[in-house]
Amino acid sequence: MLLLNKLKKVIICSAIFFSILFLNGSNYAIVSPTKDFYVNDYANLLSEETKKYILQTNQDLNQKTGAQIVVVTVKNLEGKSIEEYANQLFREFGIGDKEKNNGLLLLCSYEDRMFRVEVGYGLEGCLPDGKTGRLQDEYIIPYLRENKFDEGIRNGYSAFLGEVAEEYNITIDRREEATIKITSTQFV
């Protein structure tokens, strides 16, 4: 009987421990890559045309260079900082060629109203922090401020795609230039 009581206590304590662990862990779960990999539109912000464009141009980019530009939209960051969330996504998705570390992540959190670009070390030469900030300010942020997420993300993606293509001295099939060039001061 004494052994049975100890066993019950161990089972109850274990159940409590794993419940707490599971509940805390669920606050920090991040999304998994979709079957399309390059487009992970969990916040439903992108048009089918934009998704198709990102998929087609990425396939060409990856085939020619091994580089990958992954777009992820989420409803919110589930309590994480955008830097932490983007870093974890970048690592877990395995973006870019493993040896060249030439991946690029464009992350948009709809409810948090935040956008982040995560650059692999292999692309930091052509996309240093200052340049990624300027590209966001010029091609993405003005649209996001106006709730034009599809346009902003597509324009930003096109701008980053152009920079990566230029770095590798290649032409991307079906590549379109950003539709409108706007500075962030026009929306202040």
Where in this protein do the model-derived segments appear?
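Folded, non-transmembrane soluble domains that reside on the lumenal/extracytoplasmic side of membranes
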Residues: 26-187
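Intrinsic disorder/low-complexity signature
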Residues: 2, 21-24, 38
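Bacterial N-terminal signal peptides
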Residues: 13-22
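Bacterial N-terminal signal peptides that target proteins for export
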Residues: 2-12
